[in-house]
From Swiss-Prot:
Annotated segments matching region Head domain (RuvB-H): 253-342
Record's subunit section: Homohexamer. Forms an RuvA(8)-RuvB(12)-Holliday junction (HJ) complex. HJ DNA is sandwiched between 2 RuvA tetramers; dsDNA enters through RuvA and exits via RuvB. An RuvB hexamer assembles on each DNA strand where it exits the tetramer. Each RuvB hexamer is contacted by two RuvA subunits (via domain III) on 2 adjacent RuvB subunits; this complex drives branch migration. In the full resolvosome a probable DNA-RuvA(4)-RuvB(12)-RuvC(2) complex forms which resolves the HJ.
InterPro entries: AAA+_ATPase (IPR003593), AAA_lid_4 (IPR041445), DNA_helicase_Holl-junc_RuvB (IPR004605), P-loop_NTPase (IPR027417), RuvB-like_N (IPR008824), RuvB_C (IPR008823), WH-like_DNA-bd_sf (IPR036388), WH_DNA-bd_sf (IPR036390)
Chain intervals for the UniProt region annotation (Small ATPAse domain (RuvB-S)): 180-250
Protein name: Holliday junction branch migration complex subunit RuvB
Gene name per UniProt: ruvB
Predominant subcellular localization, coarse grouping: cytoplasm
Subcellular location: Cytoplasm
Amino acid sequence: MTNILSPEKIENDQELPIRPSYLQEFVGQQQIKENLSVFIKAAKSRNEHLDHTLFYGPPGLGKTTLAKIISNEIGGNFKSTSGPAILKAADLAAILTNLEKNDVLFIDEIHRLNTAVEEVLYPAMEDFELDIIIGEGPAARSVKITLPKFTLIGATTRLGLLSNPLRDRFGIPMRLNFYNTEELKKVLNRASKLFDIDLTDSGSEEIAKRSRGTPRIALRLLRRIRDFAAVDGKSRVDKEISDFGLNRLEVDHIGLDSNDYRYLKFIADNYNGGPVGIETIAAALSEQRDALEETIEPYLIQIGLLQRTPRGRVITIAAFEHLKMPIPNQSHHQFNIFNENE
């Protein structure tokens, strides 16, 4: 699922020129920044490596950026890979043996590591040792290789899919949360200076309110609104051109697009608001379950239009009101579901 409001990184996203390099430049996630600053200073004062760190939460909130910032702050090299790219234990061994002291190894989508790779990672994280089997059959022998003290940073949008043994080996787990409007305005204002865009306060607020609490989406929308302004002969991005451009992009006043409406209307029209299983929704909308769970559902839940329950997905009364649809008489089913969870 690729669209203007996807929190996933897409090919034409230009984040590198505006990516902050140090914690003091990073906007939002204040508690995470403050805690990381303490942990980094403490590790440096003891001349130790930073504890292995796990960032989790919806996509587009800055997990990769924070990993690079940590690397800059502790003065190590930054090595990046992803769970799907490490197919076998030998792939991980090759990466680990090329690390130096204080290096940061960033593994995106770490929940997608297979079991064989995880088994190699455990002693590397705990004891900084790598067990390698040399030879085959009766002649095979195990050789231990000592690794330099490095910091592993994992990132995942699906914490529940991370195995317990792997999750427990991270000394610093941190959840990234959606941004509020004021934080997104700061992100946009910083980017507008780097992109040389004349962005007014009302323009940045309009874009921020419709960016689904996600900096990556806000920056993408800013670039598209700049295009509308340029073609319309406007030298600045104000509220008027922002509203015009966002309407053309079919982004409504709370950040919903056609995919969100398809999702909500399917449950409203066919299941009277729910509950309905995610597999049924995915099949009906011809979408992958993962795409719905990572791209659409988190924001709908955040703004109170959707709930996940043991019996399936349920849209709220607020969702019916936003869709301008009559609230079904059976709306008491939502309260029955809450009671089951108590």
